[in-house]
Curated annotation (Swiss-Prot):
It comes from Novosphingobium aromaticivorans (strain ATCC 700278 / DSM 12444 / CCUG 56034 / CIP 105152 / NBRC 16084 / F199). The gene is gatB. Coiled coil: none annotated. Allows the formation of correctly charged Asn-tRNA(Asn) or Gln-tRNA(Gln) through the transamidation of misacylated Asp-tRNA(Asn) or Glu-tRNA(Gln) in organisms which lack either or both of asparaginyl-tRNA or glutaminyl-tRNA synthetases. The reaction takes place in the presence of glutamine and ATP through an activated phospho-Asp-tRNA(Asn) or phospho-Glu-tRNA(Gln). InterPro entries: Asn/Gln-tRNA_amidoTrfase_suB/E, Asn/Gln-tRNA_Trfase_suB/E_cat, Asn/Gln_amidotransferase, Asn/Gln_tRNA_amidoTrase-B-like, GatB, GatB_C_1, GatB_Yqey_C_2, Gln-tRNA_amidoTrfase_suB_CS. PROSITE patterns: GATB (PS01234). This is Aspartyl/glutamyl-tRNA(Asn/Gln) amidotransferase subunit B. Belongs to the GatB/GatE family. GatB subfamily. Heterotrimer of A, B and C subunits. GO terms for biological process: glutaminyl-tRNAGln biosynthesis via transamidation; translation.
Length: 497
């Protein structure tokens, strides 16, 4: 891929991007209390005395939250720090009842790691490694609600104290596409691990986007931080718009100010929120209510043993062991639910065919990607809501494989399956869709077509071999799509010489 550059009035500019991703930890309880974490609960119904910062209430670390952070670090090949510590980040805001946030500035639980991203879906060589500086665990704040009263804002503390992983990348990205690819890959890894559901629309994963511009080869410029961006598409838009804004500002003789900004998706622009604070503004110091975290080898081994097959390893296995194309392997592993669905389909298909999975993998993958995805997309549905299960898909593939129906008829059957929820065999029987291999009937249809198209027969015999497809199509049409394509091809070749 060509390098991304912003063409200004005075020449080319390079954009430098780093992301700080806040990922809500998948856990039934909060980081330092036993309060629930379910999304969508009534305001202030999931708040403990610790979350509300009542006097005398002391935090107790949730083992599961620590475990999920360690597993995430292992999934990105990061250094796991056996000794880490919590710090207080001091600031005042109405949604922060303690007056400080418990975070990890000086000694995070996870150190340096990296993620490899593919920048072009159709080019497996378009790889780039994005460095990750650290992952630290911290509390989320509450939520201000401004639409409940004409003159007052209300506070919902359900989110207060929920565990977050802040995943801080290095400034290694150089284009909106790279930022989007990195965020998508990170979300995929988190979903595979099960440490965050990655639902950006629900706020359980959001990104702070750091952007600066410079002349190629020069030192980094002054960066701005656009807070709480909640979709991959918006992150890419922020990078593009903020970089263009900075270039225009500099070329007009202005100076980029280190500040915090917000993104307005309706106007597709960023706007200033406040000046950007430095660490000393928050007066960090070790939290006196919490002992340092000390992780032993047994705990780390437990975390490592619980990791699933990760997307890069799964993709490699699909290509090498199952013989799938790099593109198909990429599509099937980009989402953990898709990978699970495919593997269930593959197991069912192999069992019905009494063949190894490697022999039926291409058929299963092609059908899932080309047929089922396309049909679901037309309906505005997804695999999660599909009435067609992996077992039902395998039943349909078995009917194609044994010659009961043709590929074209299978498309009709799939539409009926999605419409009714019925099985493929029942639909084929009810609708009379079985494929015929009756050579007499097929031969009669071919004879009629050749007689009606004598001119094309002459052209074919004169060397215009592309017309063979025309004869096949006409025969299938005459047989209402029910003729066995193999028999049609064989008989046509005999008759056309």
């Amino acid at each position: 891929m060509s390098e991304y550059r912003i063409q200004g009035a005075t020449g080319e500019w390079e954009v430098v991007i780093g992301l700080e991703v806040h990922a809500q930890v998948t856990s039934n309880a909060k980081l330092f209390s036993g309060a629930a974490t379910a999304f969508g609960a009534e305001p202030n119904t999931q708040v403990s005395l610790v979350d509300a910062a009542m006097p005398g209430m002391l935090p107790v670390p949730n083992r599961e939250c620590i475990r999920q952070a360690v597993r995430t670090g292992m999934a990105i090949n990061a250094q796991i720090n056996k000794w880490s510590r919590f710090d207080r980040k001091n600031y005042f805001y109405a949604d922060l009842p303690q007056g400080y946030q418990i975070s990890q500035l000086y000694h995070p639980i996870v150190g340096e790691g990296s993620i490899e991203v593919q920048l072009d879906d159709k080019n497996p060589e378009s790889l780039k490694t994005i460095g990750i500086e650290r992952i630290h665990v911290e509390q989320d704040a509450g939520k201000l609600m401004h639409d409940q009263h004409p003159t007052m804002s209300y506070v919902d503390l359900n989110r207060s104290g929920v565990a977050l992983m802040e995943i801080v990348s290095r400034p290694d990205m150089r284009s909106p596409a790279e930022a989007g690819a990195y965020l998508s890959k990170l979300r995929t890894i988190l979903r595979y691990v099960g440490s965050c559901d990655g639902n950006m629309d629900q706020g359980s994963m959001r990104a702070d986007v750091n952007v600066s511009v410079r002349r190629p080869g020069e030192p980094f410029g002054t960066r701005t931080e656009t807070k709480n961006v909640n979709s991959v598409r918006f992150v890419m838009a922020v990078v593009e718009q903020e970089a263009k804004r900075q270039v225009a500002l500099i070329e007009d003789g202005g100076t980029v100010v280190q500040e915090t900004r917000l993104y307005d998706p309706d106007r597709n622009e960023t706007r200033s929120m406040r000046s950007k604070e430095d660490a000393h503004d928050y007066r960090y110091f070790p939290d006196p209510d919490l002992l340092p975290l000390e992780l032993d080898d047994a705990f780390l081994e437990e975390c490592r043993a619980s990791l699933p097959e990760l997307p890069d390893a799964k993709r490699h296995r699909y290509e090498t062991a199952l013989g799938l194309s790099a593109y198909n392997a990429g599509v099937l592993t980009a989402d953990v639910e898709t990978a699970r669905w495919f593997e269930a389909l593959l197991a069912e298909t192999a069992a019905k065919a009494k063949k190894p999975e490697a022999e039926v993998a291409k058929q299963a993958a092609n059908w899932l990607i080309s047929e089922l995805f396309g049909a679901l997309n037309k309906l505005g549905a997804s695999l999660e809501t599909s009435p067609v299960t992996p077992a039902a898909g395998a039943e349909l593939l078995a009917l194609i494989a044994d010659g009961t129906i043709s590929g074209s008829i299978a498309k009709q059957v799939l539409e009926k399956m999605l419409e009714t929820g019925d099985g493929a065999a029942a639909i084929v029987e009810r609708e009379g869709l079985k494929q015929t291999s009756d050579t007499g009937a097929i031969e009669a249809a071919i004879d009629g077509i050749l007689a009606a198209n004598a001119d094309k027969v002459g052209q074919y015999k004169a060397g215009k071999e592309a017309l063979f497809g025309f004869f096949v199509g006409q025969t299938m049409k005459a047989m209402q799509g029910k003729a066995n394509p193999g028999v049609v091809n064989e008989l046509l070749r005999k008759k056309l010489g």
